From Swiss-Prot:
GO terms for cellular component: cytoplasm. InterPro entries: AB_hydrolase_1 (IPR000073), AB_hydrolase_fold (IPR029058), HAT_MetX-like (IPR008220). This is Homoserine O-acetyltransferase. Signal peptide: none annotated. Homodimer. The active site is at S153 (nucleophile), D311, H344. Belongs to the AB hydrolase superfamily. MetX family. It is an enzyme of class 2 (transferase).
């Protein structure tokens, strides 16, 4: 554990609720939400910030769980004393989405009627349902209005949904490397990943136990990971070496890297959750043009929209569509396209310019 600039040891907590009515009409009962908090809630409870994670993320956004942890939470560079989300100033909340597999209710949860994991019997969940569960947690913590909701990628979709579903419950909204809806290409990549899982001999219609569809999930992660990088970054990192020319093994370094990413992913993620969460992403849509403007018209908060020049999964054009609709709806919005060669994952990586932008947006309440 490297404590330099870190908030130190953090404990994941759990909140349980009786039920959660879902968008599709079904009811999830009971509902467990795994979450972590960093910093101190002010007496007036006006300094709370909700951080929303991406597809494979979790509630562990900062700090360490134990002295033996080698890596901190997934956004530790941005959350902590003096950082963008300054824990000396703000009370930070991060929860695992429902449908996920990191402590919140999802396919790995025990079905109350069968005593076995839900598996594919878990109800379909949407981005709206994820946000609805987060609202339960925020209220449970005694917070009426959030100072900010922030997230990248899928987390950005959740932040957008917060702005229109609960317009009176947040003052600021930060959307990074995200979109208001998936394009056909974005859906296609997710579908290939899902089909890899469904074709695994251990799939068993989603009712697997210890013999899970690891190979299929690894392939799904390999496909997804390609979209997180940029062509320039892959060329710089791997090039074309070393070409081994063996038909039975991976020929190039990039292949070995993707295999490693896939194999390591299956030890920390569930195949059913991958299907549920990617479907939630694909189904979410606020529309385009006038439809998007109308959807965002109920928002009352300030917006910061950030895109990245080399992000080809959620390219800057999709962020600009959001900005255009916010401006058409006469909303307060600041937009920045950061020059980065790291691809979609840029929002996760330490970037002095990004640190400055996030910190400045939160501190300067008079702009834009």
């Amino acid at each position: 554990m490297n404590e330099s600039g870190s908030i130190g040891i953090i404990e994941t907590k759990y909140a349980e609720f009786k039920e959660l009515p879902l968008k599709n009409g079904s009811v999830l009962s009971p509902v467990v939400i795994a979450y972590e908090t960093y910093g101190t809630l002010s007496p007036s409870k006006n300094n709370a910030i909700l951080i929303c994670h991406a597809l494979s993320g979790d509630a562990h956004a900062a700090g360490y769980h134990s002295e033996s942890d080698k890596k901190p939470g997934w956004w530790d560079d941005y959350i902590g004393p003096g950082k963008s989300f300054d824990t000396n100033q703000y009370f930070i909340i991060c929860s695992n989405v429902i449908g996920g597999c990191k402590g919140s209710s999802g396919p790995l949860s025990i079905h109350p009627k069968t005593g076995t994991p839900y598996g594919s019997r878990f109800p379909f969940v949407s981005i709206q349902d994820m946000v609805k569960a987060q609202k339960l947690l925020v209220e449970f913590l005694g917070i009426d209005k959030l100072f900010c909701v922030a997230g990248g990628s899928m987390g950005g979709m959740q932040a957008l949904e917060w702005s229109i579903a609960y317009p009176d419950s947040l003052l600021n909204c930060i959307v990074m490397a995200s979109t208001a809806e998936h394009s056909a290409m974005q859906i296609a990549f997710n579908e290939v990943g899902r089909q890899a899982i469904l074709s695994d001999p251990n799939w068993n219609n989603g009712l697997y136990n210890e013999n899970s569809p690891r190979k299929g999930l690894a392939l799904a992660r390999m496909v997804g990971h390609i979209t997180y990088l940029s062509d320039d970054k892959m060329r710089e990192k791997f090039g074309r070496n070393p070409p081994r020319g063996n038909i039975l093994t991976t020929d190039f370094a990039v292949g070995s890297y993707l295999i490693y990413q896939g194999e390591s992913f299956v030890d920390r993620f569930d195949a059913n959750s991958y299907i549920y969460v990617t479907k939630a992403l694909d189904h979410y849509s606020l529309g385009k043009g006038k439809e998007l403007t109308a959807a965002l018209s109920t928002a009352t908060c300030r917006f910061l929209i950030v895109s990245y020049s080399s992000d080809w999964l959620y390219p800057p054009a999709q962020s600009r569509e959001i900005v255009k609709s916010l401006e058409a709806a006469d909303k307060r919005v600041f937009y920045l396209e950061l020059q980065s060669g790291e691809g979609h994952d840029s929002f996760l990586l330490k970037n002095p310019k990004q640190i400055e932008i996030l910190k400045g947006f939160l501190e300067n309440q008079s702009s834009p």
